[in-house]
Design a protein with these regions (language model features):
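Serine-dependent protease modules
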Residues: 2-268
Length: 270
């Protein structure tokens, strides 16, 4: 899998200081072309009080990171819970262009997924505006290191927050009682819609995939990200799966079966 666009195609070059680190503004400028907004649309079926069935359209927002490209697709990493149960998925890129995407692969145990956007659907302007993120090494993180989070907070579009590495190898129990793998803890603001977005070091490299926050009135500044060193081998496997595109109604198959209630006469006949 190769890069979607060079840094010079996507953004003006920014130079690091003598320490080899960028400012927060420089990290944002360099890396926002690698981060996308994801919208998950579905129809929820609910049984009402009288035994009938009601259908309600549902829409949720998340984030994603451009992690690769093959001959025909731009590949975007995100959280599994961002795309789970979707009827349709759309991806908004840095130039605000929106394209339909398909799930390429998911790993629910690690809350990771890859979605694919067909290059043939995309304009030249969009392709020139984006780039594949640079991958860092989350195994080398130090507590107190500054980081930048980019994501689609509250579905409003891309926003940037900054903070510090608060802890590493943090295991968290979710509301279902499931204990996560070892996560990066940061006080950079991680809000609904940030899931699947990028946690970056000050060299502009991806070090984590934002996935959760502690939500309670007495809690502040406790966000969590999947370390990229954990995520990368899983994403590599998902990226190399075959994308299964949904057929439209004109090409959808059918099994030719009609269902009937079985009465006593039918039972005796068959």
């Amino acid at each position: 899998n190769s890069a979607a666009g060079s840094g010079s195609d996507a953004t003006e070059e920014v130079s690091a200081g003598t320490t080899g680190e960028y400012t927060v503004a420089q990290v944002a400028k360099s890396c926002m072309p690698s981060v996308v907004s994801i919208t998950n649309a579905s129809v929820k079926t609910v049984q009402d009080f009288f035994g009938g069935v009601q259908q309600y359209p549902s829409e949720s927002s998340g984030s994603g990171i451009i992690v690769g490209q093959n001959d025909s697709e731009i590949l975007v990493a995100t959280n599994n819970h961002v795309v789970a149960d979707a009827d349709t998925i759309t991806v908004a890129f840095d130039d605000d262009a929106v394209y339909e995407a398909q799930v390429k692969g998911t790993d629910s145990d690690n809350d990771l997924a890859v979605v694919a956007v067909k290059i043939s659907d995309m304009s030249e302007d969009t392709l020139k505006s984006i780039k594949v993120v640079s991958i860092g090494n989350s195994d080398e993180l130090e507590i107190g290191e500054q980081v930048v989070a980019i994501g689609n907070a509250l579905g409003y579009g891309q926003s940037v927050t900054s903070g510090w590495i608060s802890a590493v190898d943090r295991e968290v129990t979710d509301e279902d009682g499931k204990t996560t793998g070892k996560l990066i803890q940061t006080d950079a603001a991680i809000n609904p819609g940030n899931s699947g977005g990028a946690l970056l070091n000050m060299q502009g490299e991806l070090i984590g995939i934002n996935s959760a926050k502690a939500a309670a009135t007495e809690v502040e500044g406790m966000g969590y990200a999947i370390p990229v060193s954990v995520a990368q081998p899983i994403l590599d496997e998902l990226m190399n799966r075959e994308t299964r595109y949904k057929a439209d109604e004109d090409h959808a198959g059918y099994i030719g079966v009609t269902c009937l209630n079985v009465d006593s006469t039918s039972a005796q006949t068959y």
